[in-house]
Design a protein with these regions (language model features):
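Conserved acidic donor-binding segment of nucleotide-sugar-dependent glycosyltransferases
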Residues: 309-316, 323-330
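Acidic anion/phosphate-binding donor-loop and adjacent secondary structure
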Residues: 175, 183-200
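Active-site donor-binding segments of glycosyltransferases and PAPS-dependent sulfotransferases
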Residues: 5-99
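Short hydrophobic beta-strand element within catalytic cores of glycosyltransferases
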Residues: 287, 291-294
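Aromatic "clamp/platform" in nucleotide-sugar-dependent glycosyltransferases that forms part
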Residues: 274, 286
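Conserved donor-binding/catalytic core segment of Leloir-type glycosyltransferases
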Residues: 204-220, 226-229
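Membrane-proximal helix-turn-helix segments that form the acceptor-binding/catalytic region
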Residues: 132-157
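Short alpha-helical donor nucleotide-sugar binding micro-motif in glycosyltransferases
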Residues: 261-266
């Protein structure tokens, strides 16, 4: 019997949970979502999560996931064994999950990040010069290296971009690696009437709105964005989905319809990141036809091709040039961007992931 177990560890608000959920939406006839919960800080697990929840008695993520996962989550492994046959497939939806002991040829992992930058202090984690932080990061990085070594024994690996795929090959992976781009949510669609949307969202109608959607991790390079906003004149206004920057207009915990309206209300998406494994905001901007001013890094070229305004992420002068050029050419790439966004549609993703499972495991 065709059966796939999707193992997730992330809370419902996270991009990793959404990735797991999107796979489930495409494969619900023969898949089941297994959620390994280390903590309930968001207090939303039971209300919003799909699938079964298996809870660790220990709330320390490092201990629960890395050091003793086979002990703390033995009920999850037992459930999978008892509710399926040998033809089961176990899909770990993120590389930080510590794998259980299942058939390596019927297991697959999705790896979302370049292992080199993911293991570098101050890229995905705080760059504070703090001894305790550094000690914890050393423990964390050792555990991730241990996980990666175990995943290198798998027959199959999925990556979210060719950039990550190439980094894994360089790292030493000799598995059968396949790139399947994550999908953009169905809520992202172009909307006419920018002024009306701005009025509804209480955004200024007489400003050039620059949109920034990100966490505040060091790799997001928000210091450069702050420098940019200090240089630009008052005709520009920053709109942030995330923590505030200077006098930005801020949104948080917005619903699906509102986030789409925010994209459609703004003039340019700004992405000064040093490092991304994929870069969902860029794919979302392409989908609605919002011009993108982004770092001149490999992953953004993979997503946007020639239909973006690139800049050196170490130069605020180049960032300013890129943004002003984008503002002066708002419709230059719009049609080509929307056309290119089909690579990241939910329909394309569903077709790719179902074909992948069939070809690798159920032929």
């Amino acid at each position: 019997m065709k059966k796939i177990f999707l193992l997730n560890y992330a809370p419902p608000s996270s991009s990793i949970y959404k990735y797991s959920q999107r796979i489930y939406e495409c494969t619900s006839e023969y898949s089941e979502q297994i959620n390994l919960r280390y903590s309930n800080r968001s207090n939303k697990w039971e209300q919003t999560v799909q699938g079964r929840i298996f809870e660790s008695p220990v709330k320390n993520v490092l201990s629960a996931n890395i050091l003793f996962s086979s002990v703390f989550f033995r009920n999850a492994r037992k459930y999978i064994l008892n509710s399926s046959g040998k033809d089961r497939v176990v899909h770990y939806t993120h590389q930080t999950l510590s794998p259980f002991k299942f058939d390596l040829e019927r297991s697959v992992v999705s790896i979302h990040d370049n292992p080199y930058t993911g293991l570098k202090y101050g890229v995905y984690t705080s760059d504070r010069q703090n001894t305790i932080d550094k000690m914890m990061f050393r423990l964390y990085s050792r555990s991730i290296k241990h996980n990666l070594a175990r995943y290198m024994k798998f027959k199959y690996v999925i990556t979210t971009s060719d950039y990550v795929k190439n980094s894994l090959i360089k790292y030493g992976f000799r598995n059968e690696i396949t790139t399947i781009y994550p999908p953009v949510g169905n809520q992202f669609v172009p909307i006419e009437g920018k002024e009306k949307i701005r009025e509804e969202l209480k955004l200024p109608r007489d400003k050039r709105l620059l949109l920034s959607v990100s966490t505040d991790q060091p790799r997001k390079n928000l210091k450069l964005l702050e420098q940019l906003m200090k240089r630009l004149d008052k005709s520009f206004q920053l709109v942030r989905v995330g923590k505030p920057i200077l006098n930005s207009i801020n949104f948080s915990n917005v619903d699906q319809q509102t986030i789409n309206k925010i994209y459609n209300a703004c003039d340019v998406l700004v992405m000064p990141s040093f490092e991304e494994g994929f870069g969902s905001p860029v794919a979302e901007a392409l989908t609605v036809g919002l011009p993108v001013a982004c770092s001149d890094i490999e992953i953004f070229h993979e997503l946007c091709g020639k239909y973006a305004f690139y800049f050196d992420p170490n130069s605020v002068e180049d960032f300013e040039r890129s943004v002003t050029t984008a503002v002066e050419n708002l419709d230059l790439y719009k049609d080509k961007m929307i056309e290119r966004s089909s690579n990241f549609s939910h329909l394309t993703f569903c077709s790719n992931i179902n074909n992948y499972y069939d070809q690798k495991f159920f032929m």
